[in-house]
Amino acid sequence: MKEVLPLVVLCLATYHTHSIKIGISHNYNATISPTASTTTEAPATTGAPSSETVSSISTLPEAEVTTTTPAITFPPRVQQKPKVAVASPTMSTALPLNSTEVNSTLSVSGDNTFYYCSCDLQAGRCDLNCCCDNDCPLETRQVFNCLPNSLLPQLESRLEDFQYTHGLPTCQINDGWLCVFRSNTKATKTQPPDMNIDTSQYRKWKDNLEYQESDYAQSRPSAGHYKFGQTLQLWQPETKQLATLELPAAYESPNCQLKQSVWHLQPIRHVCRMKDSAQLQESIWSLLNQTSNYEILSKPRDLEEPEVNGLIVQVCLRGANKSMRCLERGNDTQLDVIVDHVELQLIHNFTNILEAKLFLEEAKLAEDDNEPLWLRYNVEFVTLNESLTKPTSGPLGYLSGAPVILSRMLPQNSSEDKQLISYHSLNQNIKEFHWLSLPSRKPRGSSCQRALDHKEALRFGIDLLTRCELRHAAPLLQAHANHTEYCQGLQAQIWSLLLPHNCTQLEDVTKVFVSHLGRPQPDKWLPMEVRYPENVHEMPPPVQAVYDEMRQSLSCRNIFLSVGYEFHVAHLAMVEGRAPHQRVLQHARLVLGQRHDLEFDTSEIEVALPLSISAMFYRMQTKALSNGAAVGIAGHLVLVEMIYLGIIYLGSMQLCL
């Protein structure tokens, strides 16, 4: 039995918090009977699952490859391709939902194998100015300023030319003992220079002397819809006056002294500093007078149309308790509350504005009158089916800084033959958070908090380390109390902060899957592996409660206070090379920290436990590249040493001669 290490006393300085002893858990012998004053309570459950449960989602066996390799000669010469017998391809990293029955457990959607659009970042939703997006209707091409089809360099442009751009010549030019031999590349084709260069698509300086069309021709739309970036128009039905929708803006100053027009499909976020509450109230009244007297045109006005129909802006007030109260037309200018946040929400179908709503959020005034007041303006463009879309983190692979996508296995009914991931479920009643939300520290304190918001989710490629405290009520130290229930509840509350969302025990992690791609596909999900470093073949021992009647103390054994997430990243070329350098996840792992023993006494009213959580992203090629670079450097050093010794030897021969 290992020697018991001394307990580490962590003093948590709070007004109700007292000292708590945290020690390292050890393997206790269950056959040794405790003393008369000590009571050990076994958990009510049957214990942690065996290693068979974790290994049920395992890697598929790789395909057997039989290859005949000819003799290697230097310099290499053109040889016939060896005959390769390859079995049916399988995925050893991105696993199906059940490795034992692949064909019967996968739910395959439509064939999108050869579809790739570099600007299509959201599945089931049309992306702005992305004309190759399958989710965009044909009418949007008349509205968008189309982005290029691919923002990444093509594979052809990444072939390096060893003839002129490197120090080593090719063997075609200088066939020596040190040259580059490229036998598998196609012969370079020299094209005659094109003398007729079209520069119409390039950016140019604007010619101020060029003839400009009249205001009538510019204001008259060609197709009866807004273009991307076109100014939204207001209409006064009584005076038949046309105006533009403008909001206060600031330039090189926190005070908003300018006006900025609202452009179609372009969100706006402005923050303006106010002198006092009177100026704040005056700004709100000015905006409400504009929205009550004017209507927003759903499309630019056509001078040939006799009647103009505008959209009435609906004004709603958000209270401090997130309550919503919409005001009637005519009474929306009489507000006695102080507002510090204005949000204009425009619902559209890309070509026209369908509905307009103005949300006013009540301000929380500070006790200090000298604290400055700020007024925030937000303009959001929302599509009709935006809430029904699934989250994505890239056109195919992950974008750097995009949220890591998670999902879980749905419970399988007896009538269903296929087991589905909740991300691909068509049931709209299932509301699930598809990101890995990690706890953070409160701004004013060290307590842990967790918000189900994509802004707080783990970002791809960004390592993270968070330390915070969990505050929990002290146990009731009585001889006949259920101490095991308290210790298990304490560990469950810790797991609710350290594990993915809706996971209160380690068994729930086996149902969590991580998307292999930034644009999830039904058969490209990775299981979240649970790794216990003390014994990689078994799960950790269950939580135990030991009550010492003589000392009036309770010990919760085998408590975990820290975890670490590990993700292995690879860069692959997909879609037959048309989507190069895609960042994908190859492996996801949850590594458990060290087990601890927590000891509580009667002097404690509230306990504060230190928690730690980390997330690391590893490139799978980094280790191989670093080792290869070391070998290459060593080889170069040996070569340089041989050349150096050869020069010395030749020099000595010359001296002797």
UniProtKB/Swiss-Prot annotation:
Region (Disordered): 35-57
Glycosylation site residues: N29, N98, N103, N289, N331, N349, N385, N413, N482, N502
Mutant lacking the gene: phenotype: Simultaneous knockout of B9d2 and tctn is viable and does not show sensory behavioral defects. Males produce motile sperm and show only slightly reduced fertility. Sperm flagella show weak ultrastructural defects including broken and disorganised structure. Length of the transition zone is decreased and recruitment of the tectonic-like complex compromised.
Membrane topology: Single-pass type I membrane protein
Principal cellular location given in the protein's record: membrane
Keywords: Cell projection, Cilium biogenesis/degradation, Cytoplasm, Cytoskeleton, Glycoprotein, Membrane, Signal, Transmembrane, Transmembrane helix
Stretches that traverse the bilayer: 630-650
Tissue: Expressed in chordotonal neurons in the antennae and male germ cells (at protein level).
Name this protein carries in UniProt: Tectonic
Organism: Drosophila melanogaster
Encoding gene, per UniProt annotation: tctn
